[in-house]
Swiss-Prot record:
GO CC terms of this entry: plasma membrane
Membrane-spanning segments: 24-44, 48-68, 82-102, 142-162, 194-214, 218-238, 292-312, 319-339
One Pfam family per UniProt: SDF
Name of the coding gene: sstT
PANTHER family, sorted: PROTON/GLUTAMATE-ASPARTATE SYMPORTER, SERINE_THREONINE TRANSPORTER SSTT
Subcellular location: Cell inner membrane
Main location: membrane
Top-level division of the source organism's lineage: Bacteria
Role noted for this protein: Involved in the import of serine and threonine into the cell, with the concomitant import of sodium (symport system).
Protein's name in the database: Serine/threonine transporter SstT
Membrane topology: Multi-pass membrane protein
Signal peptide: none
Any Gene Ontology biological process: threonine transport
Catalytic activity from the UniProt record: L-serine(in) + Na(+)(in) = L-serine(out) + Na(+)(out); L-threonine(in) + Na(+)(in) = L-threonine(out) + Na(+)(out)
Lineage: Bacteria, Pseudomonadati, Pseudomonadota, Betaproteobacteria, Neisseriales
Length: 409
């Protein structure tokens, strides 16, 4: 018994990032050496992601409602500058992907890529309609289905009603509930090393690395664009806001948010992680409690890259020449589509036919491109989610620190 306690204390003294790195390395080894054991270990990953997904909608609803309920008049949340950063970042990602698609034209083999059963949206109007319908969804259904647009809308309305008509005791109860749910999130995050171990070992056991070899150039363009945004464009945007070296903040967000998101492959599941990081960075709670869930819905730089690169690859494969005006239009369409990706089943991949329609590409061909996206999804979806989610907290921090700098001046 004493040995067990001392072992747990010893593990507890090791930083969580190092524990995750150990879980990652062990997962790669187990998944490669013993696929059967790796698949069995996948249960730990499923439980971890399931726990995060389960707590995230409740956390967002209660935290936002509590924040608004206790919001004092004259104490602004400063959300607008963050939304502007989200849109700038997403458009920059789409434009970068267009340029990369022109400089490094990619042809893909479509025959035998597989079938995709889900139906893509027919146009921008349908994407926007989906977002608006999510806004007025039943609040219970919104929480049950992790509809964050609906959750945010109802939490804002309920919080405003409590602020104006609730008693001090009622508002304190809601605040205590928010603190309790945040504590539960901390407990879940402590199991991240075990969860990452399960996710990695099962992924390696199921797919190996061979399935990705045939699409190496396409993956290189996708990952290259995402790396350029994460390590060049985003730091430039952050510097513009805070006017000092942005890389310590950038690397902190990539390390403490991006790593989780890469393996969970879920922006929703990463909301609690981003909330905890924002609190650790000392950001304004009234701001991050709203901007981070909102970012998980509309801040989609990774999705914009995926939509654009695969649409450009489809055009090159079909022998279509893309002029600059069309490429610029594609950037705008990809930006709007990416912002609506959370409202579409299948996310960014099923918005590819929408972008392909700009080039007059047949829907059957576009859906084969989507199927290719699912094949490379093991890497593409992980990298996309890591970029999307880490940027949520990065831009929130940049806007908050920039506001503090302006106030100090």
């Amino acid at each position: 018994m004493a040995f067990g306690k001392s072992l747990f204390h010893a593990i507890g003294r090791v930083s969580l990032v190092r524990q995750i790195a150990a879980g990652l390395a062990l997962g790669i080894v187990i998944g490669s050496v013993s696929p059967q054991l790796g698949l069995a270990a996948g249960l730990f990953g499923s439980l971890f992601v399931g726990a995060l997904k389960a707590v995230a909608p409740v956390l967002v609803f209660i935290l936002v409602a509590a924040t608004i309920a206790q919001h004092q008049k004259g104490n602004k949340a400063h959300i607008r500058p963050i939304i502007v950063l989200y849109l700038i970042g997403t458009f920059s990602a789409a434009l970068t992907a267009v340029i990369a698609g022109m400089v490094f034209p990619t042809h893909i083999v479509l025959a035998g890529a597989g079938d995709v059963s889900a139906a893509p949206p027919s146009g921008i109007v349908e994407v926007l309609k989906s977002l608006l319908m999510n806004l007025v969804a039943n609040p219970i259904n919104a929480i049950a289905n992790a509809n964050y647009i609906g959750i945010l809308a109802w939490a804002l309305v309920l919080g405003a009603a409590l602020r104006n008509h609730g008693s001090d005791v009622t508002r304190q109860v809601v605040a205590d509930l928010a603190e309790a749910v945040s504590t539960v999130v901390k407990w879940i995050i402590r199991f991240a090393p075990l969860g990452i171990f399960g996710l990695v070992s099962s992924t390696i056991a199921e797919t190996g690395f061979g399935a990705l070899a045939g699409y190496a150039k396409l993956l290189a363009v996708l990952l290259g664009c995402m790396a350029f945004i994460a390590l060049a464009v985003n730091p430039a945007i952050v510097w513009w806001k805070i006017r000092r070296n942005p890389f310590p903040l950038v690397f902190t967000c990539l390390r403490e948010s991006g790593v989780y998101a890469f393996f969970t492959r879920s922006s929703a599941a990463n909301i609690p992680v981003n909330m905890a990081l924002a609190k650790k960075l000392g950001l304004h709670e009234d701001t991050y409690s709203i901007s981070i869930p909102l970012g998980a819905t509309i801040n989609m730089a990774g999705a914009a890259i995926t939509i654009t690169v695969l649409a450009m690859a489809a055009a090159h494969t079909q022998g279509i020449t893309v002029d600059f005006a069309t490429a610029l239009l594609l950037s705008l369409v990809a930006t709007v589509s990416a912002c609506g990706a959370s409202g579409v089943a299948g996310g960014s991949l099923l918005l590819i036919p929408l972008a392909c329609s700009l080039f007059g590409i047949d829907n059957d061909v576009a859906m084969q491109v989507v199927a290719v996206g699912f094949i490379i999804g093991v890497i593409q979806d992980s990298a996309e989610t890591a970029l999307n989610s880490s940027t949520d907290v990065l831009f929130t921090a940049a806007a908050d620190l920039g506001r503090q700098r302006n106030r100090a001046e």
